[in-house]
């Protein structure tokens, strides 16, 4: 009996949908890119229940004739290419003819469309990829696609979708990136009936950055414009004062297409070495223009990644573009942090300094002698410092090498965690205003109860603006906005499930801000104190992010290496 069979069309469609439609944000991306390819100048995205219940994308693009509308729901039907040679120079966002039929295969989809030259439009209703009805429809020129009950017929896929709040935040982030790709298009995103993002469509990228990341960030952006080797780089890079704790605010486009690129990110990060505070990452929005034949956009099912024919040239051009732009505007800061109590983050050129020291009411919380420590931690004696970041220590069983930043992070993390568990927040005499938009705004809404338990009270104050009224009792004045935005940035990636996990995120962010940095040489007493405090920690061998704080080279291993056995 034959074991190999040709799959039926329904199964093939669901497999294809699994590659293209990973989550609701992928649906939004594909539908919006179709709208942009259709020449839309206004795009409205409206979602309910994180996109699982409903996604509606409305555009004022060219619309489709009845025959084209029906073909658009068939696999591999596209207006973007006509032959294999066209793949060598793709100039549109979509080109495979997979998105719409893949979405239809795992949802209940309604397509309404009308070309401007036609007095009537077309409406198609589908379920699980099957066309249920086709008819005539009115409405303005353009296209409206409504997707309901996403993954209703693929329960295995639905199990891996996160909460509605999380999926909504992912959509908000994706729409923000799409808006940054086309500042000449007016975008509007509505989530559960509430507008969370709107861009003007003025064509000014800085306006779009202000709408997506906030006006405070836009004011601190430096223009980037550079051409070399047939490549062009344009966009903006943020000054150190608006740096972030993660790379999530670094956005790259190639010929107008949003991509994920560790390669471009590495080029930009390397160019900023010495300009950004240690452990911080610049806000970046960069558009790279290349000849279509120099980039392959057909290497990823969701087109998130591309391949360059001359990757080294791309790296060099991005590196130079960012470095020259920032160096024209600011002077590279020199850190002069001499000991554990002075870890600093200079905010050069902005009049803004990230406040990393924390003042506690009633004094700094200490790891007291009676606190529960790790019972097996060895007694260590500091021997010296190995640049850039390592303390050498001797123990009864060998040589220990301590990563001073990771160790200091662990000590501070446990201090802050106990304080968060034991103390309430303190009310600020003057509330601090902070701009929070997009995914971070959704995260703020989702974690409101946990924030209050950790000592934060944050209230809305107009579109994209919030007032911080209460903060953890130990926080130094001036650090409120930076801490909150970094906490929200971390939460967007980690999504803690309870108040304890939330407090750990807050404590980890604080510890990372405060901990001594590489290159800071500790004095002898400071090194000894750090070793003692680390030994009193409940988990001394790992920093809050899971990296080792120290390693041991035993005496037998040393003897073997020196051939003394």
UniProtKB/Swiss-Prot annotation:
Domain of life: Bacteria
Chain segments annotated as coiled-coil in the UniProt record: none
InterPro entries in the cross-refs: DNA_mismatch_repair_CS, DNA_mismatch_repair_MutL, DNA_mismatch_S5_2-like, HATPase_C_sf, MutL/Mlh/PMS, MutL/Mlh/Pms-like, MutL_C, MutL_C_dimsub
Matches recorded under SUPFAM superfamilies: ATPase domain of HSP90 chaperone/DNA topoisomerase II/histidine kinase, DNA mismatch repair protein MutL, Ribosomal protein S5 domain 2-like
Entry GO terms, CC: mismatch repair complex
This protein's UniProt keywords: DNA damage, DNA repair
GO function terms (MF aspect): ATP binding; ATP hydrolysis activity; ATP-dependent DNA damage sensor activity; mismatched DNA binding
A Gene Ontology biological process term: mismatch repair
Purpose of the protein: This protein is involved in the repair of mismatches in DNA. It is required for dam-dependent methyl-directed DNA mismatch repair. May act as a 'molecular matchmaker', a protein that promotes the formation of a stable complex between two or more DNA-binding proteins in an ATP-dependent manner without itself being part of a final effector complex.
HAMAP family hit by this protein: DNA_mis_repair
Entry's family note: Belongs to the DNA mismatch repair MutL/HexB family.
Name by which UniProt lists this protein: DNA mismatch repair protein MutL
């Amino acid at each position: 009996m034959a074991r190999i069979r040709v799959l039926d069309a329904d199964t093939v469609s669901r497999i294809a949908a699994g590659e293209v439609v990973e989550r609701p944000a992928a649906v939004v991306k594909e539908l919006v890119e179709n709208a942009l390819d259709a020449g839309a100048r206004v795009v409205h995205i409206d979602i309910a229940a994180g996109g699982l219940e409903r996604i509606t994308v409305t555009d004022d693009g060219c619309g489709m004739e009845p025959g084209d509308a029906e073909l658009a729901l068939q696999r591999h039907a596209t207006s973007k290419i006509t032959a294999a040679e066209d793949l060598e120079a793709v100039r549109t966002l979509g080109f495979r003819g997979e998105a719409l039929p893949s979405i239809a295969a795992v949802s209940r989809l309604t397509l309404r469309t009308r070309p401007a030259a036609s007095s009537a439009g077309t409406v198609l209703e589908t379920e699980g990829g099957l066309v249920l009805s086709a008819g005539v429809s009115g409405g303005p020129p353009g296209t409206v696609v409504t997707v309901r009950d996403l993954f209703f017929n693929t329960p295995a896929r639905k199990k891996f979708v996160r909460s509605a709040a999380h999926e909504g935040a992912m959509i908000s982030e994706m729409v923000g990136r799409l808006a940054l790709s086309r500042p000449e298009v007016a975008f509007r995103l509505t989530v559960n009936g509430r507008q969370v993002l709107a861009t003007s469509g003025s064509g000014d990228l800085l306006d779009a950055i202000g709408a997506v990341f906030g006006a405070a960030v836009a004011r601190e952006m430096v223009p980037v414009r550079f051409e070399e080797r047939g490549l062009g780089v344009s966009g903006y890079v943020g000054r150190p004062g608006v740096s972030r704790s993660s790379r999530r605010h670094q956005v790259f486009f190639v010929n107008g297409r949003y991509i994920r690129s560790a390669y471009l990110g590495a080029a930009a990060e390397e160019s900023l070495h010495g300009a950004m505070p240690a452990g911080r990452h610049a806000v970046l929005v960069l558009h790279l223009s290349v000849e279509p034949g120099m980039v392959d956009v057909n290497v990823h099912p969701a087109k998130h990644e591309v391949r360059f024919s001359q990757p080294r040239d791309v790296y060099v051009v991005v590196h130079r573009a960012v470095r020259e732009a920032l160096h024209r505007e600011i002077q590279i800061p020199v850190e002069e942090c001499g000991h554990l109590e002075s870890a600093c983050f200079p905010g050069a050129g902005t009049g803004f300094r990230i406040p990393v020291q924390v003042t506690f009411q009633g004094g700094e919380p200490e790891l007291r002698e009676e606190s529960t420590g790790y019972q097996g931690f060895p007694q260590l004696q500091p021997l010296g410092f190995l640049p850039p970041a390592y303390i050498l220590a001797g123990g009864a069983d060998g040589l220990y090498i301590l990563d001073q930043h990771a160790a200091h992070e662990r000590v501070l993390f446990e201090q802050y965690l106990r304080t968060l568990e034991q103390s309430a927040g303190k009310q600020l005499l003057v509330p601090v205003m902070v701009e929070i938009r997009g995914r971070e705004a959704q995260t703020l809404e989702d974690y409101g109860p946990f924030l209050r338990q950790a000592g934060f009270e944050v209230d809305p104050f107009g579109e994209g603006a919030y007032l911080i009224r209460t903060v953890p009792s130990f926080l130094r004045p001036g650090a409120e906005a930076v801490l909150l935005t970094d906490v929200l940035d971390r939460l967007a990636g980690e999504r803690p499930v309870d108040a304890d996990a939330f407090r750990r995120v807050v404590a980890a962010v604080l510890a990372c801000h405060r901990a001594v940095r590489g290159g800071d040489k500790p004095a002898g007493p400071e090194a000894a104190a750090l070793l003692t405090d680390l030994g009193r920690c409940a988990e001394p061998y790992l920093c809050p992010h899971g990296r080792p704080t120290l390693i041991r080279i035993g005496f037998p291993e040393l003897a073997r290496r020196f051939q003394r056995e």
